[in-house]
A protein has these predicted regions:
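A short acidic, amphipathic alpha-helical/loop segment
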Residues: 57-64, 82, 148-149, 173-177, ...
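Active-site-proximal loop/helix segments of hydrolase catalytic cores
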Residues: 114-123, 128-179
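Active-site neighborhood of phospho(di)ester-bond hydrolases with catalytic His/Asp-centered motifs
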Residues: 22-23, 42-50, 70-73, 135-140, ...
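Active-site environment of divalent metal-dependent phosphoester hydrolases
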Residues: 28-29, 51-56, 76-79, 93-96, ...
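Glycine/small-residue-rich loop that forms an oxyanion/phosphate-binding "nest" at active or ligand-binding sites
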Residues: 56-113
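Binuclear metal-ion centers of metallo-dependent hydrolases, dominated by the metallo-beta-lactamase
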Residues: 68, 80-93, 175, 179-226
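Zn-dependent metallo-beta-lactamase
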Residues: 1-19, 26-29, 96, 103, ...
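Pre-active-site segment of Zn-dependent metallo-hydrolases
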Residues: 12-51, 56-60, 74, 110-116, ...
Length: 226
């Protein structure tokens, strides 16, 4: 499976012949200015919550590529009013799509749209097919609910966790989250985009190493194969 970091919490993930894009925040992000939006071509756009740093390019990417948006009920309604195709989930619900199964799971955070309106409650996604399973946590604090993931989903091969602190859990708590979700391989996100979430990357890697976990930190635009 090929995973490309699009900056902040944004990832492009290829599942067999389907392209999934999570939380696209590319055009407003100066750090991602080398990524051309027209080269990001999702079949599905998955949005963890309504904050601007997660949905900035959702409308354009969905429309330009005739992609299906997957998020909570409120986010899908809000985008639907703008003409975006969508499928709503709510917490604890899962659904089979062409790429595999998506389950919308709990996050401890807030959510509203850039225009200030209610965006429902924030979440994360667990995604799996017959070969691989991963978790994109969205924006969240460390929460005991994460212990439900290994009880209710296939074994995680990797997880994308926020590590930047201030608005989400920091890397110390994220390393504990890696234990809760029983996942050895973590890709960090939601760090170094803005001043309040600037962190020491070596210390972050150390925090995971101390718990026997691997923290992978990608450069914006870079890909890995898992
Ligand atoms: Ni947020
Ligand atoms: Mn955020």
């Amino acid at each position: 499976m090929k995973i490309r970091f699009l900056g902040h919490s944004g990832f492009e993930i290829k599942m067999k012949n389907h392209t999934l894009v999570f939380d696209p925040y590319i055009s407003p992000n100066e750090l991602a200015s080398h990524i051309n939006l027209s080269e990001v071509q999702p079949d599905f756009v998955l949005l963890t919550h309504g904050h601007g740093d997660h949905i900035a390019d959702a409308e354009q990417l969905s429309k330009d590529n005739d992609a299906l948006c997957i998020s909570n009920y409120e986010v899908i309604n809000w985008l639907g009013a703008k003409g975006v195709k969508g499928h709503p989930l709510n917490h604890g619900g899962k659904k089979e799509f062409a790429f595999g199964t998506a389950k919308y799971v709990n996050a401890i955070h807030t959510s509203s749209f850039p225009d200030g309106t209610y965006a429902g409650n924030p979440g994360g996604f667990v995604i799996w097919d017959d070969e691989i399973c991963f978790y994109h946590a969205g924006d969240t604090a460390l929460t005991l609910d994460m212990k439900l993931i290994p009880l209710t989903c296939p074994k995680l091969d990797f997880a994308i966790l926020p590590i930047g602190d201030n608005f989400t859990m920091g890397y110390e708590d994220a390393a504990i989250a890696a234990d809760y979700i029983d996942c050895p391989k973590i890709i960090g996100c939601h760090f170094n985009t803005f001043a309040p979430i600037t962190i020491d990357l070596e210390k972050a890697k150390e925090a995971f190493k101390n718990r026997g976990k691997e923290l992978i930190l990608l450069e914006i635009g870079d890909s890995i194969e898992i």
